[in-house]
Amino acid sequence: MARLLTSSSALRWGAVSSSQSVGRAYSSGSPDTEYVQRSIVPTMHFQKSLPRLPIPKLEDTIKRYLNAQRPLLDDVQFKKTEQLALNFQNGVGKQLHEELVQQDKQNKHTSYISGPWFDMYLCARESIVLNFNPFISFTPDPRPDYNRQLIRATNMTVSAMRFLKTMRAGYLEPEIFHLNPAKSDTLTFRKLIRFVPSSLSWYGAYMVNAYPLDMSQYFRLFNGTRIPKPNRDELWTDEKGRHLLVLRKGNFYVFDVIDKDGNIVKASEIQAHLQHILSDTTPAPEFPLGYLTSEERNTWAVLRQKLLNNGNQEALAKVDSAVFCLCLDDFPVEDRVSLSHNMLHGSGLNRWFDKSFSIIMTEDGTAAVNFEHSWGDGVAVLRFQNEVFKDSTQRPAISPESCSAPVDSSKAVQRLHFNLDDSLKAAIANAKEKFDTSVNALSIATMEFKKGGKELLKTQKLSPDAVSQLSFQMAFLRQYGKTTATYESCSTAAFKHGRTETVRPASIYTKKCSEAFVMHPSKHSPAELRSMLQDCSKYHGQLTKEAAMGQGFDRHLFALRYLASSKGLSLPEIYQDASYAQINHNVLSTSTLTSPAVQLGGFAPVVPDGFGVGYGVHDDWIGCNVSSYQTRDVRQFVECVHQSLDDIFTVLQDKPIK
């Protein structure tokens, strides 16, 4: 599964540009209290002229697929897989590919992967908790007083509404990846490009090495939810909703944050309403409704219908149409592991996992976004976090000295009541039991390597992302004695309706290098080991560039399989091969994220015997946040990652590995 958005090299399109925007000056003058910025270039200015996601040549896809299979298979297995792949290329695969190309030509408004990818997410019947929803936590406000729960919750809510208004008014700066910022990330460029018609604007940006990114996912950020339905869920958005949903102790509250004229409600009133909720002594409900959103999706679909039939239509409509969900937890965070557990799943009592996103805030003001993954890949979420962090810390709506407005919050704030019959109560108790069992099986460990980071690696002409990925390969080999299927998500937002492509970090180069470092370090000089590091870095850079340009193999093979299935054809043999199942059983699922607004990100493993590896390469350190279930030892794995990085940085000092 594509999890968090990758951002570690110059060709990790989405997050790089987003993280640049954190420190970027506003585009035209100072924004007023209703907006985070007022871009002179309309938000969707480039959308119409974005290039289309290319469908790779079938022979390139098969070649890349076999290259990725090589380190995972012995000679006999590889020969069989190679034969099946070539048969596919010259037989049914060729016909399917030609049909896919024709379909794509008839659907120029979108990409060939968009529909199948939505289906993949929305048809999945597993719980979205752990299996799909990731979290990204905010960096603390640099001023401790502003991290008080009421202060930060108020400021983030106001900044979130400023972002909503900015986006809907078309004042949000278009998302652009600047290869030459000195030339294109300038007021002069913006003044010129705004007059280029939308049908040509992308080409104008391209001329100065600037790459506008797809922003089609952004509209689903607010007022949205995933609605459980039999066999395939639906995404639902109602932009008319003006209220915020707040959860505290499993109770649901709503109040307006946008007034009837479309203005943001005064910050002092929002503060008063949140204070009212924080002071409410209503106990946690005996049967907290939020657990139902963690259910298997067909089960939840039946139960939701039962809720509607029980007279809860109005209350559920309020939940679904809220601008977003704010979860106020009544305990502090102890450390990064407890932070990760709480933001990824929590106790389940105080969550509604179906909303497009929730801001979760603990008693000490630690905040994170937990988001539903089907509607987007983190591109919009990361931009939202960057802008909200910047706005709430640089232009906070209230200060610790601010007084709440003298308003009657008991009238403005509505606590939602749900009618539950005995069968619904039993279903909630059952959902809670399943939820507790699944989250109790999850372990998380974090690691910080302090001997170097991005800056040192760049002086050595090594890709920081390649080195991180290599450390995971070495760690797995050290712990389990073999190379395993590895997935790294890479955004294809450089294309219209692009989603993600997979980088396959396990290669013949990483296998050779890992074996040399882990099994036979004394047989190789530091110079020989350094040469292997360079080979790994070069090849990883090539894979990353190909993926970002839509030239991986995973999405193409996925789309061809989807097409065969939709035509009712028998499954081609390439997909029945045990090696195909193995490479898609992603034991190492990895995703990287680096931004000044982000403290930590994480997700659960995508297979029962896997690791979920969130990582970040910073200027002078490397960190990772890893999850696993009980079949794997996650603490030992992060120790092995640390050992691997230690060995790599030792070699970079031209010293032998001890």
UniProtKB/Swiss-Prot annotation:
Biological process (GO), any one: fatty acid beta-oxidation
Keyword Membrane belongs to the record: yes
Gene Ontology MF terms in the entry: carnitine O-octanoyltransferase activity; carnitine O-palmitoyltransferase activity
Pfam families linked to this entry: Carn_acyltransf (PF00755)
Places the protein is found: Mitochondrion inner membrane
Domain of life: Eukaryota
GO cellular component, one term: mitochondrial inner membrane
EC number: 2.3.1.21
Transmembrane segments: none
UniProt-listed PANTHER family: CARNITINE O-ACYLTRANSFERASE, CARNITINE O-PALMITOYLTRANSFERASE 2, MITOCHONDRIAL
Family of this protein: Belongs to the carnitine/choline acetyltransferase family.
Name of the protein described by the UniProt record: Carnitine O-palmitoyltransferase 2, mitochondrial
